[in-house]
Structures are given as C-alpha cells and as structure tokens.
C-alpha cells in the first residue's frame, strides 16, 4: 500500500436496538469489505430480534410473559448470554442486574419520560429485582422466574453482545481493520487504521451544568494506580487508543425528568431502587464488548466507592469515572 494513498474507508450502518450502528472498514477490496460489513450488521439485527423487550415475538419478551408460570426454552446463544449476565451480576455485587425492568417501569422510563413513584411502589418493584429470582436450567436451556412480575431487560448488555457478534463476523470474513460502534456508547476496534497504531476514540464530557460543588441525592439532572483528584474545572476525559479492544461509556443524563427541584436520571441502582445521582459518567475498556457494556453500567452505579473493586475484576481492564463533584477517577 502506498503510504501517501492509504486504503479507502468503507462505511455501512443500520438502525437497531433503538440506536444507530456504524462500521468503518479498511482494506484493499471495497466490495468485499462492504459485503462483510453488511453481514456483520445482519448479526446485530438477528440479535435484536432475540433480545428486544418491545417485540412480542422475541425470546426475551416470551420469557417475560411466561417464565413465572413455567420454564421457557431459549436458544443456546441467548442462554449463554443470560449465564454471562448472572456471572457479571455476582462479580459486580449486584450493581449490574438484568432484572432491573420492574424498577425501570416503576420510575416511568420504560418507553416514557419518567415519573416520581411513591416509596411503596419502589419497595414493590425492588422485591421483584435480583438474579435470585431467575432459575437457569442448562440441561433444558430454559429460564424460569420464582415470582410473578419479574422481568428481564438486557438493555445494558445486549448492545455489547451485538457488537461482539458483529466483530466476530468481520474477523471470520478476513477483516483486519475496522471500527464498530452502537450509538457511540459502545465501540469495538479491530486492528488499527492505516498508518496509525490504533483507533483514537474520544469520550464526550458531561455537560457543565450537571456538576455540583456539594453532594446531594438526585440533584443533578489508566498501567498505573487509580488516581482520584478533585478538580476546579470541568474534567476532560482522555482520548483512548483502541486496538483489538472495546470501550463502553455509560451516563445518566440522556433521559431524565425533574420533580420537586431535583433531576432524576434513567440509570437506576438495582440495590437501592433509586436513580444514580453522584456519578455522571463511567467508561470501561476491555477486549470483550459484552463485558464493557455491562461493567460500564455497574461502574456508573457503584461510583467512586466501588471503582477500585470493579477495576480489579479483569487484569486488562481500564476504567474511568467522573463524579458530580468534578472528580476524575482513572484506572489504567
């Protein structure tokens, strides 16, 4: 390849999982790259058809409708993802939980703008949350709930799984240089772009209006030891260099509502039943996009207090959080 005339990029995209998936590919054969990219996006759409909470025909919708009354068989791929979600729930101390759906509904975020529930409603929803309510039978490849009202929502892991599937399809097609993202919140790098060591990915900082000088519940709509220093200016997340690695960013300000002078975000702590309020942004980088998707949510929920423990779950993990008090916490 002539370094002065690098391989042209081929881009493909689709809308799935309520967001836009895009793939940028580099290589010598543009037609082959485009075909590989389209096949990778087909993988994303196939997974959406299995996991969607809002499609009555999906495997997860069927589980939610029937599993409290009888075991429901699912495909091996979906069962494997549910087992992975259970492991991540345990590793995160419950900060990541795919049974969060009753709380999401309670707070009005399931297809709505959000609403303030009363304490009794929160308590009822919390009683339905927890992986102890989900019985997985590997011999039958089935799922069962022990309570009526338990629901699964794979929104915090499904996008990462879709990107992993797309990346695997690209590699099987011989692609060695590509960048995949789903709504920019989860990104996966394959190899590196021409004439570069890796893919540069910037993390957008939280809006300055969300920062607070003091702590207050619900008030606000990396090979080195962890650093945690308060700053007096808006923290600026670093630009990360990705090569055969995935990055996920979780933040709570995308969907929120105001009530009584407070702003409540859509990311909920399954352990308390309340919206996350002290951490504005969390990012995780690992080779597996399924894990970065889930663990970035767990990190946002766990906050600064749980950052060190979560960062120690994987040797190669890089993490970053930004708190409402303008504190940037990085583990590289």
Give the ranges of each region predicted by the language model:
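Mature catalytic core of soluble alpha/beta enzymes
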Residues: 1-332
């Amino acid at each position: 390849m002539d370094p002065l005339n690098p391989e042209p990029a081929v881009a493909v995209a689709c809308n799935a999982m309520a967001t836009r998936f895009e793939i940028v590919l580099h290589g010598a054969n543009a037609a082959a790259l485009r075909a590989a990219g389209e096949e990778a996006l087909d993988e994303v759409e196939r997974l959406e058809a299995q996991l969607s909470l809002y499609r009555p025909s999906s495997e997860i919708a069927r589980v939610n409708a029937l599993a409290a009354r009888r075991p429901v068989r699912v495909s091996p791929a979906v069962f494997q993802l549910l087992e992975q979600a259970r492991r991540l729930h345990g590793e995160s101390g419950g900060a990541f939980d795919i049974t969060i759906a009753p709380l999401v509904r309670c707070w009005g975020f399931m297809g709505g703008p959000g609403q303030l529930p009363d304490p009794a409603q929160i308590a009822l929803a919390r009683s339905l949350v927890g992986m102890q309510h989900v019985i997985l039978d590997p011999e039958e490849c089935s799922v069962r709930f022990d309570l009526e009202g338990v629901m699964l929502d794979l929104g915090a892991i499904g996008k990462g799984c879709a990107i992993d599937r797309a990346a695997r399809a690209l590699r099987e097609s011989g692609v060695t240089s590509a960048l995949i993202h789903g709504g920019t919140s989860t990104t996966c790098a394959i190899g590196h772009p021409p004439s570069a060591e890796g893919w540069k990915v910037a993390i957008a900082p939280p809006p300055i209006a969300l920062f607070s000088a003091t702590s207050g519940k619900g008030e606000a709509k990396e090979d080195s030891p962890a650093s945690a220093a308060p700053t007096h200016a808006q923290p600026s997340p670093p630009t990360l260099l990705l090569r055969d690695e995935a990055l996920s960013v979780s933040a709570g300000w995308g969907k929120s509502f105001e009530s009584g002078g407070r702003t409540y975000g859509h990311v909920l702590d399954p352990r308390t039943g309340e919206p996350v309020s002290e951490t504005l942004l969390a990012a995780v980088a690992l080779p597996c996009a399924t894990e970065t998707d889930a663990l970035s949510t767990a990190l946002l929920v766990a906050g600064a207090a749980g950052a060190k423990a979560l960062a120690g779950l994987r040797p190669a993990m890089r993490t970053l959080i930004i708190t409402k008090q303008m504190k940037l916490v990085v583990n590289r």
